[in-house]
């Protein structure tokens, strides 16, 4: 899978602003991230914050790739209506809602998944 639309954010609020402006327009993006300690010369957002912000807008993380310079790129895309939700992501959505971070787009994606689970 080719890395297209690679985005660099210094902090979570920059990613959130991008998602606010693009969650209903873009088909995907790749976000520079890290899973352990990030060197100071590579400002990036921690993986968990990338995942949480994606969920807030009804998006999901998928493929993780290492960039040539050693950094990581996480692919994000809008969640498909009938996609499977892990219990971990459902718990995260409830926590994000409690913290006042969920958007209407994120709520709709989450409620759609809850409806499917209850129907099965």
Predicted features along the sequence, with ranges:
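Charge-dense, helix-prone N-terminal extensions
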Residues: 1-120
């Amino acid at each position: 899978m080719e890395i297209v639309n690679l985005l660099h954010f210094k902090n979570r609020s920059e990613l959130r602003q991008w998602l606010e402006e693009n969650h209903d327009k873009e088909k995907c993006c790749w976000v520079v991230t890290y899973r352990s300690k990030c060197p100071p010369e590579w400002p990036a957002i921690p993986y968990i914050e990338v995942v949480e912000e994606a969920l807030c807008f009804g998006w999901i993380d998928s493929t993780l790739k290492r960039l040539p310079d050693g950094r990581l790129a996480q692919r994000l895309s809008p969640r498909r209506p009938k996609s499977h939700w892990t219990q971990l992501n459902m718990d995260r959505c409830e926590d994000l809602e409690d913290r006042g971070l969920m958007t209407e787009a994120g709520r709709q994606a989450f409620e759609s998944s809850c409806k499917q689970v209850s129907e099965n």
